[in-house]
Amino acid sequence: MPKKPVRLPFVSVCTPTYNRRIFIDTMFECFRNQNYPKDLIEWIIVDDGTDKIQDLVNLSGIKQIRYYSLDKRIPIGAKRNYMHSLARGSIIVYMDDDDYYPPERISHAVEKLMSCPAALCAGSSEMYIYYNDLGKMYQFGPYGPNHATAGTFAFKKELLKHTRYDDDALFAEERAFLKEYTVPFVQLDPLKTILVFAHPFNTIDKHIFIEKPNDYVQESCKTVDSFIRSIYETKTKAFFLGNGFIPKIRNLQETVL
C-alpha cells in the first residue's frame, strides 16, 4: 500500500532587523530561493531601525511578507517575543537579516522537526563564519546536543507554551530561551542551515571570537562554495564576498563625510 503523502506544516519565518538596508535585497534573494512551498510560508519582519525598509519591502514583490515597523528600538529578546506573538505557523524558523541561508534552510528544518516527534526545537551547534578580511573560514562548535545559536533556530510553536526570551536580553539570548539547554532538541546539518559572514555591520565584532585559542574554534578547510552551491546564487555569493556591501559601506562613509 502506498504511503500517504506527508502534509507539510505552515511555517512562520521570523526576521528582526535594525538599520541593515544594504543587506536587505540579498536577504530577499535568500528567501526567494527557498525550496519550501511558498504558499505554506508567511514572513514576519519586525523593523525597529531608524532607516526603515518599508520601501524595499514594497518593491520586493514578496507577498509572504508581513512587515511591522516599531517607533523605537527594543532589546532583541523583546523583539523575538513580539515576532512570536504574530506568528500563525505551527513551525517558526529564524532567518536573520545579514546571514546567508541555503535554499533548503526551511525545508531541512521542517523535515528534521517532523521526523523527531520528541524534539521541540532544532538548530545547529556547529556553525561556520567566513572572515572576508582574512579570507578564512572558521568552524565554531559543536558545543553540545541541545545547543545552538538563535540564527539557526527552528521550533514547534508549542515550545512557546513553555518558554520565552528575557525581554531585556540584548545578546546571547539563547540560553534562557532554551532553559539552560534542556529543551528537547534535534541538530541540523550546518551546510543546510546558515553561513555567517564577519562584516563591519555586525552587532558584535566577530574577530574577538578567534583572537584567543579555544577548543571549540578552529580554522576550517570548508569554503564559501561549500555553502553557496547553486548557479542561481552567483549574485548572492558576490555580495557576501565583499563585492556587494564593501562599496556600499564606502558610499555611506562618503555621505557622512
Describe the residue ranges of each PLM region.
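Conserved donor NDP-sugar-binding/catalytic core segment of glycosyltransferases
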Residues: 104-137
